[in-house]
Amino acid sequence: MNIVIGAAVSMEVIEGWIKQVNEEFGLTDKNQACLQHFAALKNYYIFIVESDFYAVLEPSVDIWGTREMHVVSYYIKPDKRNIRLFLKIQHKFEEISKAWDCKFLYQGSHLGDRLYSYLERNGYKVATMRKEIK
């Protein structure tokens, strides 16, 4: 897998993935906001960029010095979605987290119920709570 530290990823590559993902989910009106986000923060991210998928991870350290890895985003092209590739990506997340000496690996709340069930069976624990502010 092609692992790239933020600054080395071109905005053209990022823009291509943003357009594809947002088109699939009906979010093309969010393209510019997504581009601005990555332009501002890409130097802090770790990217896995392949022709069939991408992933974005963010290493961080909490106030007690505990290293953590956060899966900010990942996407697999619809015609390439299968359990084998999914497991390969999950394994790579763990490898990268270990290489960065992280104690915890977090994945976001946008994940579907089936994926949450799989992650729970493989050692993940619910770690965050979210409240929508209206």
Annotated model-derived regions:
Residues 1-31:
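Short amphipathic alpha-helix that is part of the acyltransferase structural core
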Residues 52-53, 128:
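A structural microfeature
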Residues 60-62, 76-79, 134:
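Short coil/turn motifs at secondary-structure junctions
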